[in-house]
């Protein structure tokens, strides 16, 4: 029976309305969640292609199904572009997410029950770096390293001392809420001192690495994992990289057949488009603008003694702010800013004293507003609007003023719609 529902707007009105509402939200909200970005229409078109119909267990030229000659071309393009982008000898573009990429890296390098040294979640790490509620913390014996209490930056001497004490089989470098450059060469030195593997999760900074604006972990890590969205500005998905042939075989086997079945070739096609975009010199300009916008926004908070900028600043696409002098906690700050169409997230800060469901801080990222074309001036304006809303959170008329200014900004920098 042939389809008679070619237009989903007519066929599924409820779904269409929900998607239209989300499109409107994205158009008229200022997006500051550090793990989010805005993809190009080319990326969306590739992801919405007929490749969604094709099952392709295995890898290019080694499939378990027929009719894969064209998806082999697509996946090979994505692999070669990823290798070129990050200077890696081997790449796997099949992980459905960054979490699955991390799971595959663990499977490739260590065994269940082995000791792993990873960044503590409260210090800026990720759930998959050993949180007890996550598969990583349930499967492996994670020990968390943190930041220096005074500087709130990584203390490599302290991490080396801790590594010598716990003798991990694997050290995980990388973060989801750390605003400073990470020295991967130092991490490799530490790993070598204790005979451990080094895994780098560069999910948040992959776009900055691709642009040459952050040290590339590929020459230092045994395995590098990443997402393909965030600063890389591709579809939601994962990526694995290595320069070691033996490890490449293990990581590929960990993804398939270890963790996944058929790859999502339509998403892989979108990854290929995003990698091509990131190879364009214009992407470096974009990444530079992300860093400049983030620094400009952070500076506004740094100059206001009602707020505390964690670690005193930022080197990348994000920063953390302690908001407890002006509002009870980060959860309330997040909810309040949602009301004025500014989207960000509550976030624990180093040595957090509040519940992770409340937190003392908020996390702010500038990748998405930069994709809209906003610059340093707009970034400073947004910072002032956030401060105005938080300081006056019990004054509805002022919150309405902020909401109006947010709408003026988003109208001036449309995302997909044209004014």
Curated annotation (Swiss-Prot):
Ribonucleoprotein is among the record's keywords: no
Pathway assigned to this chain's UniProt record: One-carbon metabolism; tetrahydrofolate interconversion; Amino-acid biosynthesis; glycine biosynthesis; glycine from L-serine: step 1/1
CDD domains the record matches: SHMT (cd00378)
Site (Plays an important role in substrate specificity) residue list: 229
Record InterPro entries: PyrdxlP-dep_Trfase, PyrdxlP-dep_Trfase_major, PyrdxlP-dep_Trfase_small, Ser_HO-MeTrfase, Ser_HO-MeTrfase-like, Ser_HO-MeTrfase_PLP_BS, SHMT-like_dom
Entry EC no(s): 2.1.2.1
Cofactor requirements of the protein: pyridoxal 5'-phosphate
A cellular component annotation (GO) from this entry: cytosol
Catalytic activity: (6R)-5,10-methylene-5,6,7,8-tetrahydrofolate + glycine + H2O = (6S)-5,6,7,8-tetrahydrofolate + L-serine
Modified residues (N6-(pyridoxal phosphate)lysine): 230
Its biological purpose: Catalyzes the reversible interconversion of serine and glycine with tetrahydrofolate (THF) serving as the one-carbon carrier. This reaction serves as the major source of one-carbon groups required for the biosynthesis of purines, thymidylate, methionine, and other important biomolecules. Also exhibits THF-independent aldolase activity toward beta-hydroxyamino acids, producing glycine and aldehydes, via a retro-aldol mechanism.
Listed name of the protein: Serine hydroxymethyltransferase
Organism: Streptococcus equi subsp. zooepidemicus (strain H70)
Taxonomic classification: Bacteria, Bacillati, Bacillota, Bacilli, Lactobacillales
């Amino acid at each position: 029976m042939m389809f008679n529902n070619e237009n989903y707007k007519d066929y599924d009105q409820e779904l269409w309305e929900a998607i239209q509402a989300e499109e409107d939200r994205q158009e008229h909200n200022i997006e500051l969640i550090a793990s989010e970005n805005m993809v190009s229409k080319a990326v969306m078109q590739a992801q919405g292609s007929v490749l969604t119909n094709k099952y392709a267990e295995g890898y290019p030229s080694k499939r378990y199904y027929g009719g894969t000659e064209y998806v082999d071309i697509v996946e090979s393009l994505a692999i070669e572009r990823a290798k070129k982008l990050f200077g890696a000898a081997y790449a796997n573009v099949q992980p459905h997410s960054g979490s699955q990429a991390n799971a595959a890296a663990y499977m490739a390098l260590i065994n269940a029950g082995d000791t792993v040294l990873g960044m503590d979640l409260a210090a800026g790490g990720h759930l998959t770096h050993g949180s007890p509620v996550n598969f990583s913390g349930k499967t492996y014996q994670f020990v968390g390293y943190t930041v220096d209490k005074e500087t709130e930056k990584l203390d490599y001497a302290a991490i080396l001392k801790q590594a010598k004490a716990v003798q991990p089989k694997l050290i995980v470098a990388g973060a989801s809420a750390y605003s400073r450059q990470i020295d991967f060469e130092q991490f490799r030195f530490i790993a070598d001192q204790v005979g451990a593997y080094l895994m780098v999760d560069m999910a948040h900074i992959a776009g900055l690495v691709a642009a040459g604006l952050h040290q590339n972990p590929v020459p230092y890590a045994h395995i590098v994992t990443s997402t393909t969205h965030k600063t890389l500005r591709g579809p939601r998905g994962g990526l694995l990289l290595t320069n070691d042939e033996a490890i490449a075989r293990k990581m590929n086997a960990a993804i398939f057949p270890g963790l996944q079945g058929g790859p999502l070739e339509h998403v892989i096609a979108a990854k290929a488009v995003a990698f091509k975009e990131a190879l364009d010199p214009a992407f470096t300009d974009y990444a530079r603008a992300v860093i400049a916008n983030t620094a400009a926004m952070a500076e506004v908070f740094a100059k206001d003694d009602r707020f505390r900028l964690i670690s005193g600043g930022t080197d990348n696409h994000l920063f953390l702010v302690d908001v407890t002098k002006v509002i009870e906690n980060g959860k309330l700050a997040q909810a309040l800013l949602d009301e004025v169409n500014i989207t960000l997230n509550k976030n624990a800060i180093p040595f957090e004293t509040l519940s992770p469901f409340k937190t003392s801080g908020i996390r702010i990222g500038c990748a998405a507003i930069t994709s809209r074309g906003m610059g340093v001036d707009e970034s400073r304006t947004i910072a002032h609007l956030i401060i105005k809303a938080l300081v006056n959170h019990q004054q509805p008329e002022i919150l309405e003023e902020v909401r109006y200014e947010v709408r003026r900004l988003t109208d001036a920098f449309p995302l997909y719609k044209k004014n």
